[in-house]
């Protein structure tokens, strides 16, 4: 692990850092507390996602560690890789490259970072993120500056082992929320970083870049087989108990066996179907079952 450091100076407005223990840190970033994670090894630090790119995440990370930073993106949505420009090219599943190229640009983030009329919104269309009306990035009438468009990502393959020095993490291909979503498994602690495939409020499988319910079901079974000790999601509530996997698996299984959700307005006022069971909700496109 990294050596003991003096107390950290104050954080930038809107960015918080939480020490989760065992060399794992959580950074919540604007506009609505997107979740990034830092895993410290003896030689390197792995940063999982970079947020929307508001403010300088790197500046805050450097208050925690001076280790070289390796960045990996769980998927290509702008709220997960908008801050990539501050780091060396990120590792990413090749199936996400087209998503990243279209959605993580500065221009896209400037247009897309607020709630959309007619449905829950905020970047990525996640529920409960962004106030009703207005723009979650506005600060007294001014929008904060965003990081520029990041460099092209570097491919990472399913099963890749990333050695941080005395600590190895594994990359798992887990399509569902998007075609190329990945999870990161910390073998030292059993922690599983799940991106947006597992969420406390709602999992979305309705966008043009989403996989299918069948993809998600298969990925959830793979996650469960790891017997993780804790799950860390890309959105609040960000720390989840592994038992939520069982409930989400059953929810997806019911959809695969004919259950139908209720119509719901989503991103941009579009319509999707929302199916809830055992406190888990999957919001999906009827054409994305299999």
Regions found by a protein language model. Name each.
Residues 1-18, 138-142:
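Short, basic/low-complexity N-terminal boundary segments at the transition from targeting/disordered tails
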